[in-house]
Structure formats: structure tokens, C-alpha cells
Amino acid sequence: MKETSFWGETPSLSFADDTDKPLSDRTASPPCDPASSLQTALDTAAAQGQTTRENVLSILRRHLGSGNATVRREFEKRRMSGIDAARALARQADDMVCALAELAAQKHESPGETLCLCATGGYGAGLLAPFSDIDILFLIPGDPTPAMTARIEFILYALWDLGLRVGHATRSIAECVRDADSDLTIRTALLDLRFLHGERGLARDLRCALGADLQNDRLCEFVMGKIAEREQRHRRFGDNPYMVEPNIKEGRGGLRDLQTLNWMGRAALGCAVSTPDRSGQPAEAPQTPSFASFGLLTDRESLRARRSWDFLWTVRLHLHYITGRAEERLTFDVQPVIGGRMGYATHGRQRGVERFMRHYFLTARDVMRLTSVLQPVVLMHLQDQTTGEPPKVVPGPEEFQTIAGRICPIEPVTFAAQPREMFRLLDCGRRHDLPLHPIAMQQIIRNERHAVTLRDDPETAKIFLDLLCEPSADETKAVPFWLPILNETGLLGRLLPDWSRVVGQMQFDSYHIYTVDEHIVEAVRMMGQIEAGRMADEIPLAYTLASDLRSRRALYVAVLLHDIGKGRGGDHSEIGADLALTICPQLGLDPEETDTVSWLVLHHLLLSQTAFTRDIDDPRTILDLADTIQSPERLRLLLLLTIADMRAVSPKVWNAWKATLLRELFSRVAEVLEGGLAATERDSRVNHARELARDGLTGILPESSIDRFLDLGYPSYWLGFDTDTQMRHARMVHDSDRYRSPVTVEAYPIPERGVTELTVLCADHPGLFSQIAGALAVSGASIVDARIHTLSDGMALDTFWVQDGEGCSFEEPHQLGRLNHLVEQALSGRLDIRKGIEDASHHSTSRRMRAIHVPPRVVIDNTASDRHTVIEVNGRDRPGLLHDVTSALSSASLQISSAHITTYGMRAVDVFYVRDLLGMKITDPVRLARLRETLLASLTSAPVTTPAS
């Protein structure tokens, strides 16, 4: 029989292995009972008269260390589940607390006084992570006497001496009730009250008092407070559960969300997602029944809830043990380690760490779905309890109903028999500006598996396209962004089978901060924002193009499908283009739209790769691009797709400089598609640029200086800079001649483009680029582009566009002065570049980023340019990388004409247009092979050595 999952029948998943089985279902070999051996050791010590505090602490410390080591060993050998290990650690702590409480009662007798020790919070729930606090409540009848205070202090100081992290409070029952009324955190911690030692009656009375107090308005206030607290926590730790370095405890879909469901359920309904360990509780404390036992969860949902608890606790314990601290963030450096320990190996093209993280993200999604299923039950029960009547239901549009202004189905059971009604409900909400009621979300989640029958249904396809193409760009409306709802409920994966392959799929790099499915959802949202004009100030060209779309449906579907091929392995652009040919007709697109979508998906990286890694001043670059695109309409659509894609990768990926490059590339290709860039026109442009420069310089510089400057530049120079920049260059040349300066450096900020333009004028010589790159590396500047021009008099006029560590321009005078000074020092031989780079390297890459592997790669292309050999170098980004690579090029006797520098997280892609000393391409196979070896060597952190001739 096919295995059923939380939400229905599940296909065989590529990440499923032994870890997909609930850990609690595996054969476990629990360690020996530490409590009995501890008591034996204490009894033996007492019989021998070794009852001093130091003697007892030595015994406790030895047993605590031995017990914790046993738990860790059994857990890491995968003979104990995460839940079982957490319970064992809690029992270890119980043994320590109870032994010290017993000793304290003997050492500090206080006749007539009663004391009750209770565990609270997560420790009270009987679960403890290796480096978490143990929270203890010292419950007393009234004000503590000096003897009672000494007794409590004895316990606390001893626990601290044992190295335990202790959170504690000393309160009476009345104080507990009072503080719980005023503090949500205290109220929550006391929900997990668990008796440890002393007077049981106090614990029983406190539980009764808290239960009597948590009724009606206070109960409603508590539940709504936990919901608000959860939303605030999500905003703080990442509202998106699919960020690639999630917080497994506090983030959305993490352990705290499951605990919140437990707290709300127990307070409002007397049941919980899972039953905590109540060993050691007094007999009068009944076990909390589960939601499933009340019929509030299906068997599939209950199974998935238990697996989620187990999986998240297992990950959390590994995280604590590996880092040696109470670490809750699943960072890049620990992900492969935990994945390996949990048995995730590489399968095909998918790495073990990616399979592990996909399992994590699918678990987080299950937790969010569980919240959507259970929270409506709790809230509706609260309303019944506080008002005495059910919520007011009024007829809604199109045979639906509304509850508190939110749309809801009249008969949820109809979704199973008529799955199209789920899409009709969403579409009705879209057209009438009605958000979904939680009950609607609950029922869609429970019935989404029936949507598989709608894959060839034209009406469903039409509704889906309407939902896709209206991504709630108007923030004044209360309606949601519909695509995340389709994704989170599972409807999208049922409608488009290949979508389910990218759900929860991460890419183990520091460039993409979202999983593939969440990145696509964000890209569609970004497309809606562009079209609505909310980014008109930032990207005016995109808004202008979006306001006159002729192929709107094709564009939105292309955004939806542009990365869907990543679920199959291989070239995702080619795979996605093929998938589009099948998916588009299924969605009701006509043949022309289908062809457009497939073409856009195939080429969705074309503009960005060309703009950031090719010389757009080279006519061959523009002509080849125009030959591929062919149509002005396709160029417009491709630019919009490119912008939406880039903006959805990460907030740090998009910047003003990249916007400038894309805009310039777009305008040049558009001009060619309209019939421009003929050779004769190129000559006239050069002459026109020279005349504009002359007109601008007249009256500023002597005529002789103007004539000299106009004779210095070659055609590529006059076509590569605007008139204002050329006028600045003319003044630099004039000042250099006037003052006979061997080196002239000028840093000019261009904040609207997000870069600082650094221009260097000096005698051309081998290694010049490398020296400047080294100086800039020492300064902390990142080079994003460079143009190298050798003037007709043999002087080099090199221009570098640089950014600071945040991707912005250098603007402060002291920053600009430092850039100039370091470059001048490097060119005069007064700067130790290697030492400066080594110093910068000590403060660069964090340990978590070093876990990301970036394979070195060198690609040499003699077809991309008519006059240059184009060399693309891929490697791990680090301070001085560009210096090392350009040193290697210089040692190979190559001249760099332009360089284009791009980083994708930790991966640097540096592209150089080079020629030999005679100005020719490099074509000799032996020389090319040697060049490739030299460049590969330069991609390591070792200094570059000059290759043998």
C-alpha cells in the first residue's frame, strides 16, 4: 500500500531515507538508569561519612558528566531519537536537582516550613537541549524565612557549581497567579509546571489556581497574546521559513511554533499536539490528551506532527553538540555536518546537505500547515466560550459565505467532491477583495490532494492565471498575495507536478537566500510591484516597459516557470524551456504565448550574464545578443523577467550599478534591433563624441591641450565614456603634463549608480592592472568593472568602478583620499601589497561561509569578440583574488583591455578581454593550455608563481 503522509498521498521523495522514519519508531538502546546508580553512589558516600558539600558535588559532577556523555553517544550513533535524548537530559537534570534538594533539606532544616521545587518552561515539559537553561520554580507558602532562603541558595549555588545554566524564581501561589496575569511569558512557563521535589500539595494547589484564573477573558487574552507574540517573533527571526539559514527554534515553522500550538491548545481545549513526558508528576496531574484523540487531527496529520517534533528536536540536539553552545541557527557551516550525521548522502545531482535542508523546509511547511489547521479550532472555541454564541455568518458572493468579513465555504466537505470549488473560492476572494477565513485555509489544506484531478480542467486553468497575474500589487487592499497561498496549501504542486520538485529545494550557496519555490513566488510578487509602479523611482525603465505590456500572461507565466527546471537536475534553463512547452497549453496559453514563455525561460539569464560579465562596448557582444533576441518585444519582456528574477534572489544582489549596466545594455541592443550600429554610423559617433568634448573644453583648457587630448584616444575610448567623463579625463591629462606627475589618481563618486569611479593616468607597463587591483583590495574596495585604455602617447588611462563592502559608492572625503593614496603607493612601490592583502584576509570570510565549496573554473573563448580572447575565471571570492588572477595574466605576457567583475555570494566570476603583446588573440593550443593551468593556480590562496616559458 502506498504510504500516506500528513497531507495525503506522497510521491517517493528524493530526500527520503531512514531519517524519514520517525526516530521514535526505530530500535533504541536506552542508556542505563542514571538515577539508581546515582542514589547508590550517594548512599555509599553517606555510609562512609563522606557527606560534605564537596563530596556530594564530586559525585554529582561525575554522574552528570557520565550520564550526559552516554546520552550524547547513543544519540550520535542514531540509537536514540532527538525526543528521547531531550527527555533523558531532562531526567539527568531532575536527578541533580532532587539530590541537591534532599541534601539541602538535611543541611538547612526549617521545621514547619514547606518547599516545593517545580520545573517550568521547556524543562517543565520534560525536554532539555544540551546547552539550554533549566528553569526552576521554588514554590513556598508565604514569605521565605532566612532558613528557607539558605536552603534555596544552597541548591542554586550547587547547580551553578555543576556548570548548569539555571533560571529560577521564588514565589508563593498568590504571587505566581499575580505575575502570570501581568506577564505572558510567566503564564506560558507555568503551563508546563512539573513537580520535582518537596511538598506535592503546593504544586497541585498552584495548578488549580492557575486553571481557575485562566478562564473567559483571560483565556482569550492569553491565546491572542501568543498569536501576536508568534507574529512578532517571526518578524524578528525571519518571517519567511524558507530562508537558507533558518532559526530552527524561533523561526517560522520551527519548534516554538509547535510549542505555541501546544500552549494554546492546552489552555483553550485541554489538549495538545503531542503529549509531553510527565514522569515524576503527581498522580493528580492528568495526562494532556492529544488533538488527535479529540478528533481535531486526522491520523495523517497526527503522524506528521509527531515526525515534525522528532525531526526538529533531532536537528536541535545535533546543532547544540556540534557548536558546543545553545545555538539555534542552522548556518552554512553546520548544515553539511548535521546532514552527514543524520545519514543524508548525495543522490545523483543533489548533494546530501541539500537533501537534508529540503527535509527541514518541508518539515517547516508541515508545521505551518498544522498551525493553519488547528488555530481556527482554538479561535472558534474561544468565541463560543467568551460570547456564548457562534460567530456571525452572513451570505457571501457566489454561493460562499463570510465570517467576520472573511470568505469561507458553506460546506467544506464539498472540496473533496468538487475540488474546483477551492479555486473558485480563491478567485471569488480576489475579485471581491475578501481575505480568506482561517477555516477556508484549513479545509483547503485538508483537501488539496483532490486538486490533482484538475490538471486538464480549462476553468481551473483560467482561474489560476487570474490569480497568478494579479499578485495583490495594491497594498491598500486587504486581500492577500494569492501565489503563496496556492504554494503553502499545496494546490500549486497538485496542479503543476514539477512545482512539487522545487518546493523546499535549497541551493547551498550564499547567493540565494530563499528556497527555489519561495524565490519564484517572490519574483512574481516583484513583477507585480514593478507593474503597479511602486518601483518607478528606482527602476523607471522597467515601469515604463511594464505599463505597455502586450504579452502580460506570457510574462507572468515565464516568471513562474523560469527556475522550475531546477527540480530535475541539469541545465535548468533548457529543462524549464522544455517543461514550458507542456505546461503552457495545460494552463490555456495559445501557441504564440507558449513559444514566448519557453524562449524567455531558456534565455532568462542572458541579459544579466551579458551585462555583468561581457564588454558591452565590444560591438560583437551587442550584435550576438541582438541576433539571439531578434524581437524588440522579446527584449522588453526579457528585461522585465531579468529584473524580477534578480530582485527576488536577495536584497543585496540588486544595486544601482547593476541597474545601470542592464539599462545601458538594453538601450544598445534595442538600437541594433531598430537598425543601428553600422560601421559608418560608428565612425560618425566617434567624430560626434570628439566634437562634443571639444565644445565642452573650449574656454576651460588651452587649445593646444584640447588638440593634444583629442588626438590621444582610440575609437573605443570615445564610444566608451560620456562627454562629462571625457572632460574630466582631459583635465587630468592637462594637469599631468603641466606638473609632470608620473602618476595621477582621481576618485569620483557616482552615488546614483552606486559606484565610485577611480581613474589612473600613468605610464603603461606590465602588471599595472594587478598593482591597482592589489591596492584596491587592501583598501577594502570591490572592483565591479574596469576599462583599460592605452593612449597614443603610451600612457595608460585606466578606469575602475568600485564599491564598498555594502555595495555602495565611496563618498566621504577621507575614503576617497585613502583610495587615491593607496593606489599611488602601490604604483610607486611603497605599498607591500601581499602583506596588506594577508591582513585583509584575516577579517574577511566567516567560518560559516568557508563551508561553501566553490570549484575553480577557467573558460577561454575566442568567438565572443572579434579582437580579443575572452577569459572567464570562476572561484571563491576573497581579498586579493583579482590581484592574483591579473598577476597571472601579466606573467603570461597578456594585455588586459577590459575586466568585468561579478560576485554571486561566495563565487566570483571575473571576465577579462585580453590580447598578446602584438595586439592579437591567443590561439596557440599549447599556450592556451598553459594559461589555463596558471589561472587555475591563481584561484587558490597561494601566491602566484610565474610559469616556466
From Swiss-Prot:
Tell me the CDD domains matching this sequence: ACT_ACR-UUR-like_2, ACT_UUR-like_1, HDc, NT_GlnE_GlnD_like
Tree of life domain: Bacteria
Record comment: activity regulation: Uridylyltransferase (UTase) activity is inhibited by glutamine, while glutamine activates uridylyl-removing (UR) activity.
Q: Which Pfam families match?
A: ACT_ACR9_3rd (PF24931), GlnD_UR_UTase (PF08335), HD (PF01966), NTP_transf_2 (PF01909)
The chain positions of domain ACT read 757-834, 870-949
Keywords assigned by UniProt? Hydrolase, Magnesium, Multifunctional enzyme, Nucleotidyltransferase, Repeat, Transferase
Enzyme Commission number, as recorded: 2.7.7.59, 3.1.4.-
Alphabetical list of InterPro entries matching this protein: ACT-like_dom_sf (IPR045865), ACT_dom (IPR002912), HD/PDEase_dom (IPR003607), HD_domain (IPR006674), NT_sf (IPR043519), PII_UdlTrfase/GS_AdlTrfase (IPR013546), Polymerase_NTP_transf_dom (IPR002934), UTase/UR (IPR010043)
* Cofactor(s) recorded in Swiss-Prot or TrEMBL: Mg(2+)
Ranges for the HD domain?
A: 516-632
Q: Which GO terms describe its molecular function?
A: [protein-PII] uridylyltransferase activity; phosphoric diester hydrolase activity
Q: Does the keyword Repeat apply?
A: yes
Q: Does the keyword Nuclease apply?
A: no
Q: Which reaction equations make up its catalytic activity?
A: [protein-PII]-L-tyrosine + UTP = [protein-PII]-uridylyl-L-tyrosine + diphosphate; [protein-PII]-uridylyl-L-tyrosine + H2O = [protein-PII]-L-tyrosine + UMP + H(+)
Q: Which parts of this chain are annotated as the region Disordered? A: 1-37
Q: Where is this region: Uridylyltransferase?
A: 1-395
UniProt domain comment: Has four distinct domains: an N-terminal nucleotidyltransferase (NT) domain responsible for UTase activity, a central HD domain that encodes UR activity, and two C-terminal ACT domains that seem to have a role in glutamine sensing.
Q: What does this protein do?
A: Modifies, by uridylylation and deuridylylation, the PII regulatory proteins (GlnB and homologs), in response to the nitrogen status of the cell that GlnD senses through the glutamine level. Under low glutamine levels, catalyzes the conversion of the PII proteins and UTP to PII-UMP and PPi, while under higher glutamine levels, GlnD hydrolyzes PII-UMP to PII and UMP (deuridylylation). Thus, controls uridylylation state and activity of the PII proteins, and plays an important role in the regulation of nitrogen assimilation and metabolism.
Q: Which family does it belong to?
A: Belongs to the GlnD family.
User: What is the protein name for this chain?
Assistant: Bifunctional uridylyltransferase/uridylyl-removing enzyme
Question: To which species is this protein native?
Answer: Gluconobacter oxydans (strain 621H)
